[in-house]
Amino acid sequence: PSTPPLEDHSFDIAASLSALDDFGPVDKGTSTGGAVDVEAVFAKFKEGVRQQVAETDAQSHYDLGVAYKEMGLINDALTEFELASRDPSRECVCHSMAGMMHLEQGNLEAAIEAFIRGLHAEQKSADQELALYYELGNTYQLRSNPREALFYFQKVMRRDAGYRDVAARVR
C-alpha cells in the first residue's frame, strides 16, 4: 500500500506578493504624484498572510518574522516571532530574535525579558544558551549594571573562555 503524498501547507510568500498585483491601478490624479501607498500595500499583503497561514504554522511565522525584520517592520516581526515561539523547537531562537530587535531599538528591559524567556525554553542547545548568557551580559552592561553583566559573562567564561570577547569583558 502506498502512502498518500504529503500536502504542502507552507506559506507561499511569492504567491502572496503576486496577489498584490490585484491591488489595482494607482490614480494618477492624486497629489502623491502616482506613488503607491506602501502602508496600504503592506496591509493587503498582511491580510493575505492572515488568510493563508495557520497560527500553528511555526515555520511560516518564523520566516515571516525574519522577512518583516529585514524590511524594518519590527512590530510585525515581533508578532510573528511570538506566534512561532509556540513551537517548543523554535521557542528559544524566536525569543533570541525578539531580544536582538529590542536591543537594536534601545529597549533594554524588553531585550532582557526576551533573552530570559529564551533561557526558559525547554528545547535549546548549549550554543543557544551560551549566546543568551552573553547577550544578557552585554545588555546589562549597556544598562550600566556591571554586577549583573559580570554574572552572565562569568557564566559564559566557565563554559567557553574563548567565546567572542568575553575574556576581555570579564577583566
Label the model's feature ranges.
Residues 1-79, 89-91, 100, 105:
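Intrinsically disordered, low-complexity acidic segments enriched in Asp/Glu and Pro
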